[in-house]
From Swiss-Prot:
Name this protein carries in UniProt: Glycerol-3-phosphate acyltransferase
PANTHER family assigned to the protein according to its UniProt record, in alphabetical order: GLYCEROL-3-PHOSPHATE ACYLTRANSFERASE-RELATED (PTHR30309:SF0), INNER MEMBRANE PROTEIN YGIH (PTHR30309)
Assembly: Probably interacts with PlsX.
GO molecular function: acyl-phosphate glycerol-3-phosphate acyltransferase activity
Tree of life domain: Bacteria
Family annotation (InterPro entries): G3P_acylTferase_PlsY (IPR003811)
Function of the molecule: Catalyzes the transfer of an acyl group from acyl-phosphate (acyl-PO(4)) to glycerol-3-phosphate (G3P) to form lysophosphatidic acid (LPA). This enzyme utilizes acyl-phosphate as fatty acyl donor, but not acyl-CoA or acyl-ACP.
Keywords on record: Cell inner membrane, Cell membrane, Lipid biosynthesis, Lipid metabolism, Membrane, Phospholipid biosynthesis, Phospholipid metabolism, Transferase, Transmembrane, Transmembrane helix
Annotated localization: Cell inner membrane
Disulfide bonding pattern of the chain: none
Source organism (scientific name): Bradyrhizobium diazoefficiens (strain JCM 10833 / BCRC 13528 / IAM 13628 / NBRC 14792 / USDA 110)
Main subcellular location of this protein, as a coarse class: membrane
UniProt pathway annotation: Lipid metabolism; phospholipid metabolism
Biological-process GO terms, alphabetical: phospholipid biosynthetic process
């Protein structure tokens, strides 16, 4: 199999890894309520935090990020950078639209960071710093993710990573789509702040 022929395989492998709903798995194992029935209904770390279980939220954040990192590292090792990017796209799509949960997944922030970490780690550091700065000043997790993801493709473009910039422009659009209800709540002043329970 040629390297280009491996791209669809990388996309599928990434999707399958990304579709593992760690937030739902961890909260069920811990005996908490169905994470999809509280807060935003998302299976991601921010919504897990609304259960009041910080350890579960941290575990979800770590495992969701690792989905993206593992996908791109494995695909990149096997078939090079294009396969790594395909796997990253697949992992992101898998997290947002997991087939196991009727295509209703998370918002993609942790996976976004994990993909960045695997493809160009300085951009992951910049993303996290932007997220932290915005979160510190506003206490809105959603706004922090939107700001950081909006700037990330420009950061990659500035440093000459044009293919990565294009990939993350697509991921940013998907992330904004996943946060469409958050954006409406931010505009109306009804968005929950970090640490607030549902």
């Amino acid at each position: 199999m040629g390297l280009e022929a491996f791209l669809p395989v990388a996309l599928v492998i990434g999707y399958l890894l990304g579709s593992i709903p760690f937030g739902l798995v961890l909260t069920r194992l811990a005996g908490t309520q169905d994470i999809r029935s509280i807060g935003s209904g998302s299976i991601g770390a921010t919504n897990v935090l609304r259960t009041g279980r910080k350890s579960l939220a941290a575990g979800t954040l770590l495992l969701d990020a690792l989905k993206g990192t593992v996908a791109v590292v494995i695909a990149g090792y096997i078939a090079g950078p294009n396969a790594a990017m395909a796997a990253g796209l697949g992992a992101f799509l898998g997290h947002l639209f997991p087939v196991w949960l009727k295509f209703k997944g998370g918002k993609g922030v942790a996976v976004y960071i994990g993909i960045l970490l695997g493809l160009f780690w300085p951009a992951a550091v910049v993303f996290c710093l932007l997220w932290l700065a915005t979160a510190f000043t506003t206490r809105y997790s959603s706004l922090s993710a939107l700001v950081a993801s909006f700037i990330t493709p420009m950061f990659l473009w500035w440093f000459g990573h044009l293919a990565l910039s294009a990939l993350f422009a697509v991921l940013t659009l998907l992330l904004f789509y996943a946060h469409r209800e958050n954006i409406k709540r931010l505009q109306s002043g009804k968005e929950s702040r970090i640490g607030e329970k549902a």
